[in-house]
Structures are given as C-alpha cells and as structure tokens.
Regions:
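Active-site phosphate-binding strand-loop segment of PLP-dependent enzymes
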Residues: 1-46
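Conserved PLP-binding catalytic core of the aspartate aminotransferase-like
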Residues: 159-189
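Conserved active-site segment immediately N-terminal to the catalytic lysine
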Residues: 53-65
Length: 235
C-alpha cells in the first residue's frame, strides 16, 4: 500500500450505513505519518463530539441542513491554524473556490461572494441557541432520541447494520427484504417518513434519522408507528 500521500479525507459518519468511524484511530494514523486530516462531518456535526485540537484535524466540513436544521444552501468549513497555513502556502487555482479569498474576507466579517443570506441568518440564530443551551445538552438529546428508537426495536426482527452506529441515524436491515413496504406503510398509514437506501440495498435497508428539528413528541409518534408496524407483521 502506498502511504506517501499527504492528506487523509474521511467521512466521520457514513450516512448510508449509519457507521461512525473511529476518529481517534484515524487521528493517530495521520499523526504518525505527518499527514493532514480533513474531516467530513456533514451529518456528524453536533450529533457527535468533534474536538479539532484533540484530533489534530486541519479541516472540518459540515452543512446547514443536517443537525443545524436550517435550510440547505451553505457549506461550512473550519480550518485549524495549520490548515490556514497550508492554504496560504498553496497557489490559487480558481477564484470562486479560493480559500485565501474566503479567509481574507472573513477578517472583515464578510464572504467573498453573496451567500444564501436567509440561511446564514438561520445558522447564526441556531448557533447562538446551541451556545446558550450548551453543546453537550444538544448532543445528549440527539443520543437520547436514537437510544429510545433502538431500544424499541430490540424485540423485532430488524437488525442494526453497523456495530458502531452514530447518534445521527439508525440503519436497519430487514430480513424479509421488505424495506420499501415498511417505508410505504409508515408514510401512508402513520404519516411518518422513513429514509430509503439506494442501490443494491434498496430492498434490505432503511434508515431513521435522529437529527434536526425533532421534538420528544415526534420521537414518541415514531416509536408508536414502529411498534404498530411490528404488530402488523412487517418486521
């Protein structure tokens, strides 16, 4: 295996399978080899603990539409001091995608190009809300929602796909290969929208999200729906 590369880009949480990767292991791997670490945390942000300094992460990426529960349209990038140094050392190859330009404008509290302004205001309000409440409380609520759903399914035939699932989503395997029927019945019979999987696993796996603007009452309704689907013999 050629390990002469200088950067590792990793998806912290795999949304199609629900798997949460071992970031400590990947962090150690990069440190031992002097590699930069870029973390795609689009669906892991807020749902999982992400300490850039502890991980030695140079870049962390996320988006507005997942756990932030804002409208889509804005990508968010956090750079460590070392990450900013690497940006400064590299030549600009595209004006519209220039991180140098973004950092220069950030010093004056601006973006280089007009952003999705409404979404930016939403993000500002959401982050202030999280700051006031505390990130630990926010993360604990997501984890609690995930645990409640998973506990409710322990006596059914559904199987968890990953051994190390993220708080953000629960991916479930259907032994009867009737994922589409489960999704359709949940939607038409109970007004609950479950997430299908694509490709070869479209009949075998479906997913349940735990991030976003989900209330305790929403989660209780979801659990009632799943309990009813099980009683109907769908799993």
């Amino acid at each position: 295996m050629d390990l002469s590369c200088g950067t590792l880009l990793v998806n912290m949480h795999e949304t199609s399978s629900g798997l949460l990767y071992d970031m400590s292991l990947l962090s150690d791997f990069c440190r031992e080899r002097g590699m930069a670490l870029i973390v795609d945390a689009v669906s892991a942000f807020i749902a999982e603990e992400i300490d850039m300094a502890a991980l030695g992460a140079d870049v962390v990426l996320t988006g507005s539409q997942k756990a932030l529960a804002c409208h889509p349209g804005i990508s968010i990038m956090a750079l460590s001091p070392r990450g900013q140094e690497r940006v400064a050392e590299n030549p600009e190859v595209c004006s519209y995608l220039s991180l140098k330009e973004a950092l220069r404008n950030g010093e004056r509290g601006q973006t280089p190009w007009t952003p999705a302004v409404n979404t930016l205001l939403e993000i500002n309000a959401r982050l202030r809300s999280i700051e006031a409440r505390g990130i630990d409380a926010e993360r604990a609520e997501i984890a609690s929602r995930a645990k409640a759903v998973r506990d409710a399914l322990t006596s059914t035939t559904l199987e968890m796909v990953p051994e190390n699932p993220s708080n953000a989503v629960t991916a479930l395997r259907c032994p009867a290969s009737n994922a589409k029927a489960i999704i359709e019945r949940a939607k038409t019979g109970y007004g609950m929208w479950l997430c299908p999987n694509g490709g070869a696993l479209c009949d075998e796996v479906f997913r349940i999200g735990h991030i976003g603007a989900i209330t305790e009452e929403d989660n209780d309704r979801l659990i009632d729906c799943l309990t009813s689907l099980s009683a109907e013999g769908l799993f």
